[in-house]
Amino acid sequence: MKLLEDRIKKDGEVLDGDVLKINSFLNHQVDPQLMMQCGEEFKRLFADQKIDKVLTCEASGIAPGVMTAYVLDVPMVFARKKKPSTLNDAVYWADVFSYTKKVNNKICVEEKLLHKGENLLIIDDFVAQGEAVKGMVNIAKQAECNIVGVGAVVAKTFQGGSDWVKQHGLHFEALASIDSFKDGQVHFGKEN
Amino acid sequence: MKLLEDRIKKDGEVLDGDVLKINSFLNHQVDPQLMMQCGEEFKRLFADQKIDKVLTCEASGIAPGVMTAYVLDVPMVFARKKKPSTLNDAVYWADVFSYTKKVNNKICVEEKLLHKGENLLIIDDFVAQGEAVKGMVNIAKQAECNIVGVGAVVAKTFQGGSDWVKQHGLHFEALASIDSFKDGQVHFGKEN
């Protein structure tokens, strides 16, 4: 998605450790028009699939997730990183390993929000090692849902997450695929 | 907003301790069409104001916040509850007291995302005691922004948060104002 690549080139910051900071339009400040365009692009890329629900993860997945759900006219569920006090019903849990902090965190989704046989599109803002996606796939499988695909706004294809998704037979689409940060610059691949 | 009140009556669950759980369309599963309608209603209610940016708080504020920003055609910033590893620049911090857990949590916004003199519309999903709103007002003041108003998707008007906002001279709007949960039922006030 050229619009997104151009924006990453213009506003993204490459930090040490192959980290891309895009706080000005995705991860802290959000450009809602761009998020809507991402949603429309996901709709186009998964147009051959029946989608009943979008599954994403708080916090940065919510903006692209809700816009994708809006254009698909389906509900969106966001996995929570803590079980809130109002979450008094049974939940599905999954581990999400944090490479930054070297600890297992957990995400959860209330059981009654996912139904057996439902067709889920998983949306994430960033797929690097793909730990959040692995957690969402785990939860979708516990709920016996069908995963119609995984859509990433940005994928760092050299960190294994996108390969993991494809190796598990899932349809993977990234709106911007980053191959490397050689010389402190963002280098895009051909997948978008 | 009658559509929202009807939805709360239909799908909301009143729990002990004057807690309203609306996980099926706002706080865990999200109805994106309803969120867009909330955004349009906030635009109408604050139509007399110049708005440069929407400020909200992760996680449940993001969906109504980004839809409001979409219809206003302005950026949205969500305050973070933890400082992420990529947030390497200076941030504004504010305390947010948790009545459930009796502890002070913190929220933060990167300084360079808020500019002196900018006109901010603060959006929150739920205003009860209003602690998250107080934190966002605090941050907006640190940044020397103008607060053009505070919009709540749902306000529990008997818990003080909406009064606090008005007592501080701020324009307050709630799309659904709950006066009480007498007899385990949701009773709406006249403000919406």
Swiss-Prot record, chains A, B:
Pfam families linked: Pribosyltran
GO molecular function terms listed in the Swiss-Prot or TrEMBL record: xanthine phosphoribosyltransferase activity
Documented EC number(s): 2.4.2.22
Pathways involved: Purine metabolism; XMP biosynthesis via salvage pathway; XMP from xanthine: step 1/1
Binding locations of 5-phospho-alpha-D-ribose 1-diphosphate: 128-132
Compartments, as annotated in UniProt: Cytoplasm
GO biological process, one term: xanthine metabolic process
Span of the signal peptide: none
One annotated Gene Ontology cellular component of this protein: cytoplasm
Residue numbers binding xanthine: 20, 27, 156
Keyword line: Cytoplasm, Glycosyltransferase, Purine salvage, Transferase
Record-linked CDD domains: PRTases_typeI (cd06223)
Subunit structure and binding partners: Homodimer.
Function in brief: Converts the preformed base xanthine, a product of nucleic acid breakdown, to xanthosine 5'-monophosphate (XMP), so it can be reused for RNA or DNA synthesis.
Record family assignment: Belongs to the purine/pyrimidine phosphoribosyltransferase family. Xpt subfamily.
Full protein name: Xanthine phosphoribosyltransferase
